[in-house]
């Protein structure tokens, strides 16, 4: 299991990203728009660089909600492969069945 501080750090990044997502998207649209003057685009780039690093979605790590495991995490279920197998075998995940062929 991951340390609690690592899990909390990731949750903090998710909340910051959600809060500043629209502002970041507007600035990126200004930077990419070729019809706007170079000076305005540069000012938008400066404003974007002054935003917190943690507001970027790239810094968010997909983690298991139960164990905090960073690898082998299924996005659809938001749990790791180990927890998915445990929950699936006891029938806690609806619609998930053990395959046999």
Curated annotation (Swiss-Prot):
Keyword Phosphoprotein: no
GO molecular function, one term: rRNA binding
Top-level taxon of origin: Bacteria
GO biological process: one example: translation
Subunit structure as annotated in this protein's UniProt entry: Part of the 30S ribosomal subunit. Contacts proteins S3 and S10.
HAMAP family in UniProt: Ribosomal_uS14_1
Name this polypeptide is given: Small ribosomal subunit protein uS14
Gene it is expressed from: rpsN
């Amino acid at each position: 299991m991951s340390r609690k501080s690592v899990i909390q750090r990731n949750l903090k990044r998710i909340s910051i990203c959600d809060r500043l997502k629209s502002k970041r998207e507007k600035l990126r649209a200004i930077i990419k728009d070729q019809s706007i003057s170079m000076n305005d685009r540069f000012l938008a780039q400066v404003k974007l660089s002054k935003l917190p690093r943690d507001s970027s979605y790239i810094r968010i790590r997909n983690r298991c909600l139960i164990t905090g495991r960073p690898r082998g995490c299924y996005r659809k279920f938001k749990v790791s492969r180990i927890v998915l197998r445990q929950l699936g075998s006891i029938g806690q995940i609806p619609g998930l069945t053990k395959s046999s062929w």
